[in-house]
Amino acid sequence: MILDILPLAGGTARLVRVYGGEPCVKLPGAVPAPEGEGEWPITELGDYCFSEKPRGLPGPEKICRYERAEDGKLCLTRAFGRDVSGKERYSFDFDAPAAPAQDDELHPICGNFLEEVTLPESLRVIGSCTFYNCRRLRRLTAGTGELTMGSDVFLNCFALEDLVIRATPEQATGLFALVGSITEAVRALFWPVGEAAPRAGLWYPAYWEDIEETPAHILLHTFSGQGYHYRQCFLENKLLPAEYDAIFPQGHDADDASVMAMLCFDRLRWPWQLSDAARDAYRDFLKTNTGRVLTRLLKAQDTEGVKALLALDVMDADAFAEGAALAAKADNAEAAALLADAEHKKRAAAPQKKRYDFDF
């Protein structure tokens, strides 16, 4: 992986471009400064950083280029337009390390090639259109730091499904800024480093904005869908779970029923600060929509999710029949076996009707 870095005032750095051959990128938190001057923490992603057609990139005389070696160490190869790698590009010593690639030989990690990004803990700013037209970006991982977002950061990122926050739900994070930049449905997972499972899973449904001008030249700004309201449940960049859960009983007819079913499922699956009243409301909706959840879980081949759904004990005979049909359609024998086993155990645990024998 090769990084183009723009030094900033205050001893920090902005990442302006990434090159490599892997669609899943884990960005470093800092790079070594030239001439042994310590390290530059990466605090910003530049405008159009991962866009296929970047605009306004700084010239080579303003940036430093780093290459990640096989041992993971970042090595400075070019500083402000000057090659500092110490390698000759044209050499007949075939045992010598290869010289740095020229710009026209580099493969940018951008656009439809990019699938996953892990942001460093040091990051504080994401520039405008950073992920513009990254149509296959499906997961973004961020740390505990608060974030400032530019405009249209995730424009046309239609495949983005998960925001993984490496923090506890009680901590102040950049989630408020992230979901505020996404109008499509997206899930946030609070998943601290080193833990086997998330602490909380929260869905943010899609919403639409409408601006209408009346004959009196008054602008009416309206929102369709509850997604906008879910995105406001933060205070000082900390999640407000009670306010989040209070939105569901207010109605969700304008929202995608499958997304709302997943919202209920994930809140019950990881019930962080979930009140009894909210739990009952989520269970009631989930009982009549288990098929929607199973459809998504089977498509993702999420066996652990199927097990979690069965553990909630919200499926009746009709739901099991629907689930068996969905598993057969998906050709998922493991899920079909799990459903059959859960149904058998539920029937065996049910109280048996009394029988009367008149054979004296």
Language-model regions: role of each:
Residues 296-302, 326-332:
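Ankyrin repeat A-helix N-terminal signature
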Residues 45-53:
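A short, well-ordered alpha-helical element
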